[in-house]
Amino acid sequence: MAGNSRITEKFEYKTNILTSYDGHEQRIKTRQIPRHSLSYDYDAMTTFQAQWLKGMTRIRQTDKYYIPMWHKVVYLNEDFVEHGKALYINTDYMYNLEGCEWIEVFVRDDPLQTGINLVRRVDHFTNNAIILKKQIDRPMYKANCWIYPLIECSIAPQDNLQYVFANGAGLTMNFEDLLNEPRIHVPNNYRYEYDEGYYWWQLRDSIVKKEKLTTEYLKTKYPTLYKEAINKGLNPEDYIMKSFGGKKVYRDWEHFNRYNLPSTYNGYEILWHEPWWIDDDASSLSIEKNTNRLDNETGNFVYDLKNSNSYDTIAFETYMGNVKMVNNMIKFFNRMGGMFRAFYCPTWVNDFTPKWGIQFGKNTIYTELTVTYKMYATNTRKKSIVVFTKDYQSYIFDVAAYATEEIDGKWYGKIVLAKNSNITIPVERIEMISYLDLVRFSDDALTLNYEANDVANVTLSMKEVDDIN
């Protein structure tokens, strides 16, 4: 468990990696379906509860159980009519049901214990509903109904039961998903792809052509729609967006892909998540050099340079603020297959300090000269950079070479681009210039630490690779 997290979910693949002398990798995916495990913290405050936890530590290891996934709650989108089989749900939570054959429905769950809970078997999923095998003979209302997916699992050997007083105890219970068939899958559009909806900045780019959405701009560009919004007491920006078919329903705290990065580059996906800089160690960088140390233990030693490339390992902690962000992270990890596939990820730090802006038709970026230019000159790996701007845009450039140049008696670093720039970016508009590294996950396991049913954090670690060569 990480920090104060009470619920932990883990997905784990298995990848065999063969590394050649020059650092190139050949990766073999040996597990097609990831192992899935859960950890829940249970607190017992009565003798009965404490004895129940004690009993759970002594059960036969071969016993199987269905457990609710408490962090994957699903909500009704409309009231349920009795004698029906279709539960129409909020589709934001559809992916929570992936692979589940059974569900548990809590109705009017309150401290007075006047509610009930029902267990039902799933027949299939549609784009907006759970279709049950048997009907439910009572009405249910979306305001006081919760649906939890059930998974068949075994209970892993438990840690020690911790007593806090004579009648109270605590235990972290670890459950291992048995991954038994049949597994009922949600529709493919929920199962595989990013569930993005419309982003505010995508609508801004497509509708108002990158103009700032100031009040004066909206008044001038869309006077009729602006007046309609004011007359109805609505936010003009929201009203105008919806008039063009946009749904301002998914903004992910306004920080998920806030720099409008593309989804792919050079045929590889781009990871949009970025560090949140909450803790002092929120992001880190370690560097692996491809060398051998030759040491005969007599005192003298030398290093044998396999190649002049170094390999960065980027690690950072990121938070996911709603269910779509959490599920997008899981989907991305599954598409990568753990360490198997490579993808692009920005370093999210200032790797270069620009001296002047980027000019249209030019293929050079002048920066402050640092000692790292010596490393750049010897590194033979092709790299890319991404320029983040203060108006939340991003521009990717391939680097052809590095050089230095003396201008007016002062030396500057010079990034030589593979192509001439097709845009002018003034220096005062640049937020930072980061490397866009081609990486893979450095671990086959993804561990999500939940702070609420739709809020989680994860620490990602990614190692630079040479796949593009």
Show the residue positions of the predicted features.
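Extracellular/virion structural assembly segments
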Residues: 1-128, 134-469
